[in-house]
Amino acid sequence: MTKGCLVLCAVVCGAAACAPKTVAPATPPPATPAQRLASADALVRAGCYDCLLDAYGEYDLLRQFPYAKDAATLGAIRAAGLIARRQRELGLIEEGFVDRAHSLAATVTSVPPWLPVVLDLVDALPGSAGGVTRTPTSDLDLDRQRRLRVNFDIWSARVREAASTDELAAYMWLSLACSQTQTRDLTIDQLFEPVAALSDAPLIALKRATCRRLDATRLADLATANPRFKEVAYWLGLIDVGDRKLDAADKHFADAYAWRQQWPTVTESIANVAMTSEEFQRSLAFYDRTLELEPNAVDALLGRIRALTYLGRQEDAIATADRLIALRWFVGDARYWRALNESELERNDEAWMDVEAAAKLLINADVPKLAGLIAYRRHQLDVSRDRFTLAHTRNANDCETFFYLGIVNAELRDWPPAADILIGAAQCLQENDDNYLKEIDTIEASDEPPARKAAKIARRRQYIEKGRRQMATAWFDTAVACYNLARKSEAQQYAEKVADDQQFGERAKEILARLR
């Protein structure tokens, strides 16, 4: 090594030795229990479902510190009550947070006097969305409604009193006031007066966005301000359903499902959208998913029956109807759909018993229409005419009912009503034909997925073909009725309409020959 190299090495080494040493950044001290309590309180006011779960978890951990235990326990009670309410509002699987809140309250030596009342309200108040309370679907739901009705005045007064000072009380006051008929005369501003001190909290802003109606702008603003408000997607989907924006609704429900899979109201909502979109296989899959989560979900059972019926799976539909009847909910609907599937299998005696039972529980046009069809197949023509007449009275726009009523009158050789009814039925069926063609044009021009478009168009072409055969039958039977009534010009007019028809042509030509 040369002398120059030695000098260079010495200089370099000396410079390195003189360089300042890197100092590691100081580790911040851990948050104190008081700071952690404040952070958990902030999560409660933030109001999103995940925020509430995080707050509950933090309060639970803080209960191990003796000097923070009471405040942390009260915080855990508050968070548990809010989680329980949110789960019921959203229709999530309820995980016993009301019971946890009651258990925690029993460990505190001094609780606010209003707290037991608020927790009773959390337990009893039905789920609601946009002010619309969900229909009870179990004996437990009915008992909750009874308790709420009996205690409404006492509970509402106590909860309203506490609403200005506590987030749980404020949220429950608004949950009660926004959904019950007893407060319908108050404006929304009046409903929110007791919670004015908490009005800046997103927790309260969420209630403002869902009080009496769902406000898409307010909901979107909440999600923009705090992306953790994932539950907003469900409510936005409900708004889309109300606006008949089914693809947008499906997207919002899919976002909600991606966030929480254990969510039966979302899986059922996806199934309902698929049913309306005529995607029956997808609808069935999500009704089945709903029933995996909630085996006695009666709305999903009824939806499953409909999906199976439209898929032509009669035996499975009947078995599902049996399940629904055993639960003693929607018995009339279950009897109707069971009768419909039994009639498809030509079990007409069983179908008749079911449709007659349905008639005692449902007042609509569909039940007597089905009864008319079943009676016709059982060769009970007078009974059939009676049921079709009732169905037509209840829904004069059902062309098929009108058609069958005319056919039965023709078979009974009651020519005057047969002729007049069948002329009207044929006109009605022609209007249906025109409307289906317009629907096909609309579907073809839409941006729906190609597979869905093809299925919907194919289904309407089947309806058109069926309707045209019914029109041909109506024209021929009208010709027969008019011939027997000596209304020769009308008999000729309607016979000519089917003179070239493969089914009726020869007989129509025979009528025309007799008229010459």
Label every PLM stretch briefly.
Residues 34, 71, 78, 168-171, ...:
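Start-of-helix register in tetratricopeptide repeats
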Residues 41, 78, 82-85, 121, ...:
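Residue-level recognition of tetratricopeptide repeat
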Residues 45, 82, 242, 276-277, ...:
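Register position in tetratricopeptide repeats
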Residues 49-52, 91, 98, 184-185, ...:
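TPR-repeat structural position
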Residues 55, 96, 101, 151, ...:
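Single-residue signature of alpha-solenoid repeat helices
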Residues 65, 111, 161-165, 197-198, ...:
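Structural marker of alpha-solenoid helical repeat scaffolds
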Residues 75, 172-175, 207, 235, ...:
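Canonical tetratricopeptide repeat
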